[in-house]
Regions:
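Transmembrane-helix bundle segments that line or gate the permeation/cavity pathway
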Residues: 11-151, 170-182
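Loop-centered beta-sheet repeat module
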Residues: 159-219
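Transmembrane alpha-helical segments in integral membrane proteins
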Residues: 8-11, 69-98, 217-224, 265-288, ...
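Juxtamembrane loop-helix boundary motifs flanking transmembrane segments in multi-pass membrane proteins
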Residues: 1-6, 65, 100, 152-156, ...
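Transmembrane helix-loop junctions in multipass membrane proteins, especially transporters and channels
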Residues: 28, 32-40, 126-127, 182-190, ...
Length: 363
């Protein structure tokens, strides 16, 4: 029985990998055939396809940039690319679930097999210039492959689901603001595109990468609109009251950057409190008893803080060089702001009303 479960888990995990690795191989081979490579080694596109696949799981890389011979890293990876492995996992997992009646066991064995394959791919794809950080692969692929198998439509998840949908709504509003900012800075966007001059095929691939980076940029934009701010490399700061930028990389999506200070956005902190309040609104409305309201509100708030912290961490990172070591939000700063807002909302919606009821009951 155990052998059959393990075999099915490995088989379906390999199927999930193949569903996304083969398209990545096609893209890599097509790019190699049109642009070529300096070494002319046919293993380059094969390794590159694995790097694309690992990058879709947000696995960070160590880099040795040949032009400068300086070590660097790529930890700022496109969050939008997660949709591909999640789709592949959800496509393959049902057969594992059929083989193992206990759903949690099925999730564990599937995620374990998926993580093992990903770690092996990271090890065999290492080159002198690009090295996937293989020991971090389990920290990324196991949670992704495990969580992707969940059905969040269950009734017990409805409060968390509503909170997550609220966050998505605010995130989407920030994406709209990002688009408006790109339209307002069209000349800068055009100039950055001209500087890169990737050609037709390269331009299409570069456009795809920019689209996949939209969730990162939108989350950074949300942090800016809510008064938290972000960074664009070492020694920089962009917020409502500060604007210290030494230059911008030649990447079109950076054309959406603000051009100066906007002190009125300090009031965006009110939006942060509003976000948390809306997240907890169904709990406040449906639970009049203090204990039930406290339980559901605390659980939802804590899980929301964890989710926001993870998103903040994944949406930012180092972009190739040490000068761009911090591009995006500072994850612990976002977490601290969100935790403070959650504490204030819990105080005014759960604990103070509960205290008032207790005082009235004694009186």
């Amino acid at each position: 029985m155990f052998g059959r479960i393990l075999a099915v888990s490995i088989q379906q995990a390999a199927r999930s990998v193949a569903l996304t690795l083969f398209p990545a191989s096609f893209i890599s081979l097509f790019a190699w055939a049109t642009a070529g490579s300096q070494s002319g080694n046919t293993t380059d596109p094969i390794r590159a396809s694995v790097w694309i696949w690992l990058g879709a799981h947000l696995i960070p890389f160590h880099l040795n940039i040949a032009a400068s011979h300086l070590p660097g890293a790529l930890t700022l990876l496109p969050m939008g690319a997660l949709i591909f492995p999640i789709w592949a996992i959800r496509k393959s997992f049902p057969k594992v679930k059929d083989a193992l009646p206990k759903i949690e066991g099925a999730r564990f064995f599937f995620a374990l097999a998926y993580t093992l394959i990903a770690t092996i791919l990271a090890l065999i794809s290492t080159s002198s210039g690009i090295k996937p950080i293989w020991y971090l692969v389990p920290l990324f692929t196991f949670p992704i492959s495990y969580i992707a198998t969940y059905d969040f439509k269950a009734a017990e998840n409805r409060y968390l689901r509503f909170a997550f949908h609220t966050l998505i709504f605010f995130w989407g509003a920030a994406a709209i603001a990002l688009g408006l900012s790109l339209a307002a800075h069209w000349s800068v966007l055009h100039d950055l595109g001209v500087v890169i001059a990737p050609g037709i095929i390269g331009g299409l691939l570069f456009l795809l990468i920019q689209i996949l980076y939209i969730p990162n940029a939108a989350f950074v934009g949300l942090a800016y609109l809510l008064g938290i701010g972000f960074k664009l490399g070492s020694g920089t700061s962009v917020s409502a009251t500060t604007f210290t930028v030494h230059g911008i990389p030649a990447i079109p999506i950076f054309a959406a950057l603000p051009t100066g200070r906007h002190p009125l956005l300090q009031f965006g902190l009110i939006g942060l409190f509003l976000l948390v309040l809306i997240m907890l609104l169904p709990i406040i409305r449906e639970n009049s008893l203090f204990k039930s309201r406290q339980f559901f509100a605390l659980r939802t708030a804590l899980l929301a803080i964890i989710i926001v912290t993870v998103i903040a961490y994944l949406s930012s990172g180092e972009l190739l060089t040490s000068e761009l070591q911090i591009v995006g939000v500072t994850w612990w700063r976002v977490s601290a702001f969100f935790a403070a807002a959650s504490s204030a909302v819990l105080l005014f919606t759960v604990y103070i009303p509960g205290l008032i009821k207790r005082v009235r009951a004694r009186g």
